[in-house]
From Swiss-Prot:
Subunit annotation: Homodimer.
Gene Ontology CC: one annotated term: plasma membrane
Gene assigned in the entry: atm1
Lineage, broadest ranks: Bacteria, Pseudomonadati, Pseudomonadota, Alphaproteobacteria, Sphingomonadales
Species of origin: Novosphingobium aromaticivorans (strain ATCC 700278 / DSM 12444 / CCUG 56034 / CIP 105152 / NBRC 16084 / F199)
This protein's name: ATM1-type heavy metal exporter
Bilayer disposition of the protein: Multi-pass membrane protein
C-alpha cells in the first residue's frame, strides 16, 4: 500500500532503478502466489524459447554440412532431412514458447498496472482539496492514463526484449568462443558495444528533436484554435492576414522540426546498418577464409550468419525500445510522485469515530486562511445549538463558504477548534465526521448516470424504498414518475439534462438518503429564479425539520425565519440574533436588508 506521508525520493523522474525497485512489489506481490507462479512460468518460457532459438543454427549447420559433404548419398540425405525437420520444429517451438510466455505473463502485467493505478486513485481521494484545486483534473488523469498505458509496453520490452537479448548475446559469445576462438568473439562484442552506444546517442538526440516537434505542433494547433474561436474579433479588426501569418510561422517551424526528426531517423538507420553489415561481412569473410584453409565448413558460414542475424534482429528495435523504456520509467515515476504527495489533512493515529447524540456545532476561536499571507477567518467563534436553524450571511469574501469547507475538514484551521457534540473534529475519523454532515451546495454536481444512481449515492447500499422516500421528501417523486424511464433517466454530464431546480431537488434527495443529523445549505437557491427558489425553500424547510441546519445565504429573504442569524464581516462575527433583533440594531445586517429590499423594488418597478 502507498505510504501515508511522502517519502521524498531524490528524483523519481530520472532515477530509473529506484522506480523499478518501487514497482517490483507490484510485479512480485507477496500476497499472491498465483501471480508469482505466473512470473516464474513466464521466465521459464523465455528461457525455453531462447534455448530453442539458440539451437536452430546448429540444426541449420548440420543440414548444410550433410548436403555439401555427403554428396547426395542416401545417409546424407536422411541426415539433412532430419536436421531440416528439426530446424522447422525449432522455429515452431520458438513461436510457441513466445506466445505461451505472453499468455502466462499478461495477467501479471495487467494486475501490476491495475494495482498501481488503484493505489494512485485511492491516494488522490486522500489528498486535500488544496491539491485538487491547484492541479488540473485533466493533468492528473493524464498521468494515470499515460502510466497505465506505458507500463505494460515497458515491461514487455524490458522482460521479453532486453533480457532475452542479453541472454542470447552471452550465449553467442560462449558458442563463438568454443567453436571459433577469440577473434570472432572480440569482433562481435565490439560491434554490439558500438551499436548500442550509437543507438543510444542518436536516440537521445532524436528524443530532444521529437519533444521540440511536439511542442511546436501544439503551438501551431493552439494558434489555429485561438484564431477560429475568436472569429468575430478577427473580422472586426480585419486581422485575417495577421492570423494567417502567425499560423504560417508556427506551421513552418513545426515542418522544419519534423524534417529534422525524420532525417535523424534515417541517420540512425544508416549508422546501425553500417555497424551490422561491417560485422557480418567481416565474420563471413573470416569464415570463408577458414573454409578455404579446410578448417571450417560451409555449414559454419551458415552457422555464423544465422547467429549474427538472430542477435541483431531484436537490436534493430533498440532505438524504439530505449525510448519506450525511458518514457515508461518517467510515466511510472510520475505515478509514484502522486503516491508520494503529502496528505495535508489526515486522521490522527487511532482516531475514534465521531458519535453524535446532540448535533451541536461550535467554532472556538478559529483562525484560517488558504494562504499563509492572507488570513480569512480571524478568531471566529460561534455555537449552533442542537436542532436549531442557523443562517450565516455577510458580504462577499467574508468567509461564509470557508466555514463549510472547514466543517467538512477539507482544511484544518491554523488555530482554534471546531467541535461537533463537544468532540474536536480534528481528533475523529474523517469518514465518521462526513457521515454526520449533509450538504446541498449552490451548484449541485451530479454524476453522469441515472437519477436513481445519483439519489442512491447518498449512502452506499441504499434500498429502492429509501430512494423513493427521499425523492418524495425532496418533492421530486412526481417529476421522476412522469419521465418515460423514471429513475433510469440519464442526467447527463454534471446533470446538465436537468434544470437548476431539478438538480437541487436530486441533491436534496441524495442528502435525505444519507440522513445526516447536521445539514448545510451553501447558497443552495442563489442560482435559481424566484419561483423555483420559493419551491426549493419550502422543501428545504421540510427537510430541515428535527435536524441541526446551517444555511449560508446571500439573499437575506431566504433565511429571515432562521432561529439565529450570524453576520460575518471580513472573517469576524459582526452581529448575531434573530431577523427582527438585527433589524432593530440597525447595523450591517439592517444595511444589507435595506439594500436588497431596494434592489428588489427596482426590479419590480422595471417589470411593471
Amino acid at each position: 500500500m502507498p505510504p501515508e506521508t511522502a517519502t521524498n525520493p531524490k528524483d523519481a523522474r530520472h532515477d530509473g532503478w529506484q522506480t523499478l525497485k518501487r514497482f517490483l512489489p507490484y510485479l512480485w506481490p507477496a500476497d499472491n502466489a498465483v501471480l508469482r507462479r505466473r512470473v516464474v512460468g513466464a521466465i521459464l518460457m523465455v528461457l525455453l524459447g531462447k534455448a530453442t532459438t539458440l539451437a536452430l543454427p546448429f540444426a541449420y549447420k548440420k543440414a548444410v554440412d550433410a548436403m555439401t559433404l555427403g554428396g547426395g548419398a542416401q545417409p546424407a540425405l536422411t541426415v539433412a532431412l532430419a536436421f531440416v525437420l528439426a530446424y522447422a520444429l525449432g522455429r515452431f517451438s520458438g513461436v510457441l514458447f513466445d506466445n505461451l510466455r505472453n499468455i502466462v505473463f499478461e495477467r501479471v502485467g495487467q494486475d501490476a498496472t491495475r494495482h498501481l493505478a488503484e493505489n494512485v486513485f485511492a491516494r488522490l481521494h486522500k489528498l486535500s482539496l488544496r491539491f485538487h484545486l491547484a492541479r488540473r483534473t485533466g493533468e492528473v488523469t493524464k498521468v494515470i492514463e499515460r502510466g497505465t498505458k506505458s507500463i505494460d509496453t515497458m515491461l514487455y520490452f524490458l522482460l521479453f526484449n532486453i533480457a532475452p537479448t542479453v541472454i542470447e548475446l552471452t550465449a553467442v559469445i560462449v558458442i563463438f568462443w568454443l567453436n571459433f576462438g577469440l577473434g570472432l568473439v572480440t569482433a562481435t562484442i565490439l560491434a554490439v558495444i558500438a551499436y548500442v552506444w550509437t543507438t543510444r546517442t542518436i536516440t537521445e538526440w532524436r528524443t530532444h528533436l521529437r519533444e521540440k516537434m511536439n511542442r511546436l505542433d501544439g503551438q501551431a494547433l493552439a494558434r489555429a484554435v485561438d484564431s477560429l474561436l475568436n472569429y468575430e474579433t478577427v473580422k472586426y479588426f480585419g486581422a485575417e492576414s495577421r492570423e494567417e501569418a502567425r499560423y504560417a510561422s508556427a506551421a513552418r517551424a513545426y515542418a522544419d522540426a519534423a524534417v529534422k526528426s525524420e532525417n535523424s531517423l534515417g541517420l540512425l538507420n544508416i549508422a546501425q546498418a553500417l555497424i551490422v553489415n561491417l560485422l557480418m561481412a567481416g565474420a563471413m569473410a573470416w569464415t570463408v577464409y577458414g573454409w578455404s584453409q579446410g578448417k571450417l565448413t560451409v555449414g559454419d558460414l551458415v552457422f555464423v550468419n544465422t547467429y549474427l542475424t538472430q542477435l541483431f534482429r531484436p537490436l534493430d528495435m533498440l532505438g524504439m525500445v530505449y525510448r519506450t523504456i525511458r518514457q515508461g520509467l518517467i510515466d511510472m515515476a510520475e505515478m509514484f510522485r502522486l503516491i508520494d504527495t503529502h496528505i495535508e489533512v489526515a486522521d490522527v493515529p487511532n482516531a475514534p469515530a465521531l458519535v453524535v447524540n446532540r448535533p451541536s456545532v461550535t467554532f472556538d476561536n478559529v483562525v484560517f486562511g488558504y494562504d499563509r499571507d492572507r488570513e480569512i477567518l480571524h478568531g471566529l467563534s460561534f455555537e449552533v445549538a442542537a436542532g436549531s436553524r442557523v443562517a450565516i450571511v455577510g458580504p462577499s469574501g467574508a468567509g461564509k463558504s470557508t466555514i463549510a469547507r472547514l466543517l467538512f475538514r477539507f482544511y484544518d484551521p491554523w488555530e482554534g477548534r471546531i467541535l461537533i457534540d463537544g468532540q474536536d473534529i480534528a481528533h475523529v475519523t474523517q469518514t465518521s465526521l462526513r457521515a454526520a454532515l449533509g450538504i446541498v451546495p449552490q451548484d449541485s454536481v451530479l454524476f453522469n448516470d441515472t437519477i436513481g444512481y445519483n439519489i442512491a449515492y447518498g449512502r452506499d447500499g441504499a434500498s429502492r424504498a429509501e430512494v423513493d422516500a427521499a425523492a418524495k421528501g425532496a418533492a421530486i417523486a412526481d417529476f421522476i414518475a412522469r419521465l418515460p424511464q423514471g429513475y433510469d433517466t440519464e442526467v447527463g454530464e454534471r446533470g446538465l439534462k436537468l434544470s437548476g431546480g431539478e438538480k437541487q431537488r436530486v441533491a436534496i434527495a441524495r442528502t435525505l438518503v444519507k440522513n445526516p443529523p447536521i445539514l448545510l445549505f451553501d447558497e443552495a437557491t442563489s442560482a435559481l429564479d424566484t419561483r423555483t427558489e420559493q419551491d426549493i425553500l419550502s422543501t428545504m424547510r421540510a427537510v430541515a425539520s428535527h435536524r441541526t441546519t446551517i444555511s449560508i445565504a446571500h439573499r437575506l429573504s431566504t433565511i429571515a425565519d432562521s432561529d439565529t442569524i450570524l453576520v460575518l464581516d471580513q472573517g469576524r462575527l459582526a452581529e448575531q440574533g434573530s431577523h427582527l433583533d438585527l433589524l432593530r440594531r440597525d447595523g450591517l445586517y439592517a444595511e444589507m436588508w435595506a439594500r436588497q429590499a431596494a434592489e428588489s423594488a427596482e426590479v419590480s418597478e422595471a417589470a411593471e
